[in-house]
Amino acid sequence: MSLMPFAPSRPLSIGVELELQLLGCNDYNLAPSAPEILRRVAKRTHPGEIKPEMTRSMIEINTSVQQEYAGLVTELRALRDVVSEAGCFLNVAVAGGGTHPFQHWSEQKIFDAPRFHYLSELYGYLAKQFTIFGQHVHIGCPGPDEALHLTHMLSRYIPHFIALSASSPFVQGHDTGFASARLNSVFSFPLSGRAPFVLRWNDFEKFFAKMTGTGVVESMKDFYWDIRPKPEFGTIEVRVCDTPLTVEIAASIACYIQAMSRYIMVEQRMAPEEDDYLVYTFNRFQACRFGLEGVFIDPRTHQQRSIREDIMEMLEHISDHARELHAVEAMERIREILIVGNGTSWQRRAYASEHNLADVMQLQAELWMGN
């Protein structure tokens, strides 16, 4: 199977996908209610898309193509409200967060769709363990070579995106010590990690042809890379974020990535180098384990600082670009996260107060649904 042509798209356009938790209101455990929710929302007019995910306790919302923060957050709120209203009718709550804190993977049910059944057969129990919840951000690119350039230049900042969105400290009733435990599950898949260091689209087409020739992959969907080109949309897709606890934070992180992309395209003159990946796995681990307090090593200068400090410096670099993109409000929310903490900090504070993970999930659902 050949690689799809890289579709035209408006540079720096944005789109967001969010995977959401469905919770029974009696115990705030995951509830296999996606089929019923989807039947109800199908009767409603709404923007974007509302889709099933791997297991029946999940649902995905996708925005349409947007240009700036105001339109993006407005559409995310509308999608949130449609799903939340359908859930309320069914006594099901909806929540953000990267993991459910006390569900057990063995209890999950695969959603009845051919691709999900295929993945379940292929990956076995990993498919049910993939009941985790992430945010994907699409950035429009002017062409395929530019998409590969942006893929590699943004890879340096993967720890920023992980640390800002981190909201998955609890797994199966325990605090893992990680800010984002969700990404440990993603790393279990054989085609996860970073994209190969290829800078020209014709070379990427050759790589893809070799991979399909082995029978290992059939399409770009089979690559679970942290950032991957999405040729059918004309975008790159950043895939490392936990689903944040509110749509406002989700939109703000997306616009942080958008403003950074504009900075890279317009102002930054560095070319990507393969040695940029020397500390990639270390920096990624630091973000997953310690969040904003993690150590960040600059791959070129070898300077060490906290991820929080690196984000603060980046906010200065991209301030003019954020202003051009009408994303000043989004950047203010990013600064607020640096001060008050990410979703993991909120969840741990809630657990310290409530001493019960079901109560934490009730509060988390109320926060997501805007109650």
UniProtKB/Swiss-Prot annotation:
GO annotation terms (biological process): modified amino acid biosynthetic process
InterPro entries: GCL_type2/YbdK_subfam, GCS2, Gln_synth/guanido_kin_cat_dom, YbdK
E.C. number: 6.3.2.2
Keywords tagged on the record: ATP-binding, Ligase, Nucleotide-binding
One Pfam family linked to the record: GCS2
One GO MF term: ATP binding
Catalyses which reaction(s): L-cysteine + L-glutamate + ATP = gamma-L-glutamyl-L-cysteine + ADP + phosphate + H(+)
Domain of life: Bacteria
Gene3D superfamilies hit by this protein: 3.30.590.20
Listed PANTHER family: GLUTAMATE--CYSTEINE LIGASE 2-RELATED
Biological role stated in the UniProt entry: ATP-dependent carboxylate-amine ligase which exhibits weak glutamate--cysteine ligase activity.
Homology family: Belongs to the glutamate--cysteine ligase type 2 family. YbdK subfamily.
Protein name as it appears in the record: Putative glutamate--cysteine ligase 2
Taxonomy of the source species: Bacteria, Pseudomonadati, Pseudomonadota, Betaproteobacteria, Nitrosomonadales
